[in-house]
Amino acid sequence: MVQNILFDLDETLLDFKRSESRALSNMLRHIGVEPTEKVISRYSEINKSRWKLLEQGLLTRQQVKESRYEILFAELGVDYSAAEATAYYEDQLSQKGFMFPDTIKLLETLHGRYRMYIVSNGGSNVQSGRLADSGIGKYFEDIFISEDAGAEKPSREFFDYCFGRRPEIKADETVIIGDSLTSDI
C-alpha cells in the first residue's frame, strides 16, 4: 500500500521552463546580450546536450553549468566569465518558483493522506529559493536535493540517501512522480 509520494520539483510541480526563461533573459541582459529567440534557442540546445553528458557521467554538475555559457559566449563573441554568468543566473533562478495551474489543488488533495517529499536534481540554493517563493514547501515532510546527497537521481545512491535520512520511507510503500524516465525514476 502506498504511504509515501516522492515528487520531482522541476517540470512536475514547478514550471522550470518559465523560471529558466526569466533567469536566462535577465542574465543575458545583465551582460549586454539581447535575449532573442535565436540566442535562447541556441542556449537550450547547448544546455540539453550538456545535461545529457552529465546523465552519462561524462561531466560534473559544475562543468555543465559553466560549459554551457563558455560555448554560448564563444559563439556570440562575448567576453564574460562563465562562472560569473552561472552565479548571476542561479541567483535569478532562485527568486521565482512559478507553479503549474493545478499544483496547489493536487497537493491539498494528497496532503494528510500520504507522506510527501520532494526529490530534486536542482541546486540546493536555487530550489530553496523557488520553494520559498512558491509557498509549497509546507506540504512536504522533507526535501532531498542531489547536491546534498552527493548523487543524482535516479541513482541508487540518491535513493539510499533519502531512505537513510527518513527510515519511515520504505521502497515498497513509495511511488515517485516526475516528468523524466531518465532523470527521475
Task: Outline where the language-model segments fall.
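Substrate-recognition element of Asp-dependent hydrolases with the DxDx(T/V) motif
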Residues: 84-85, 92-96, 103-134, 140-146, ...
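Conserved Rossmann-like nucleotide-cofactor binding loop
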Residues: 12, 19, 124-125, 182
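Short glycine/proline-centered loop/turn elements that form peptide/ligand docking sites
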Residues: 13, 105-109, 181-184
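Conserved Lys-Pro-Asp/Glu-containing loop-to-beta segment of HAD-superfamily phosphomonoesterases
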Residues: 152-185
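N-terminal helical cap/lid subdomain that shapes the substrate entry/recognition surface
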Residues: 2-101
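Short acidic capping loops at alpha-helix termini that bridge into adjacent secondary structure
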Residues: 35, 81, 138-142, 170-174
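Glycine-rich, phosphate-binding/catalytic loops in enzymes
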Residues: 21-25, 134-136, 162
